[in-house]
Amino acid sequence: RTLDGSFAGKEAARYLWEDKRVVPFLKIDKGLEAEDGGVQLMKPIPGLEELLAKAKAKGVFGTKERSVIKANNPAGIAAVLDQQFELARKVLAAGLVPIVEPEVDIKAPDKAAIEAELKRGILQRLDTIDPATPVMLKLTLPSVDGFFRELVDHPAVLKVVALSGGYSRDDANAK
C-alpha cells in the first residue's frame, strides 16, 4: 500500500526521504511458514523481481525480510540463513539494500547457544558478499553485551540494527 501511496503530491518513498529524511524500506516477506525444526522460514514471495524493480524505480532504499529461530538446531538455523542470504543477493542485484532479519525468540531456553550458532553462520555467509554492496542486519538483542561486534565490524555489513523482539522498552533499552 505505501509503495503505491503518495504524500503531499510525491510518491511515498521519495516524500519520506526528500521531505522527512526517513530512509524508505519495503517489507517484502509474505509471512512465515509453520515452525519446523525449531525455525520458521519465510513463505514464498511471488513476483519478487517485479516488486524489487518497482521499489527501486520509486526510490525505495532497501528491503526487510524476517525469519524466526526458536531452538538451537544447526540445520534449521542454516536453512534460515541460506534463505535469508539467497534473498539478500536478489535484493542486492536489484540495486537495493536488504535487511537480513533472522529473529531469535527471546523466550528460547538456549538463546545464547542459538546466538553463537547464528553468528557463526552469518559470518560464513557475509564472506560471500561483496563489501561494495553490503547488507544490513537486524538482530535480536544478544544475551552477552558486544556479542555481535564482529558482525558490526564486518566489511560486508552496512549497519546492524537492534531487534527488541518482545522485550519491554525498558528491558530493551537496558540491554
Where are these regions (language model features)?
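A structural motif
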Residues: 60, 93-96
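Short glycine/threonine-rich loop-to-helix capping motif typified by GTGT followed
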Residues: 77-78, 109-119, 143-154
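Alpha/beta catalytic barrel-like cores
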Residues: 1-61, 69-71, 122-124, 128, ...
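Conserved, mostly hydrophobic/aromatic
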Residues: 100
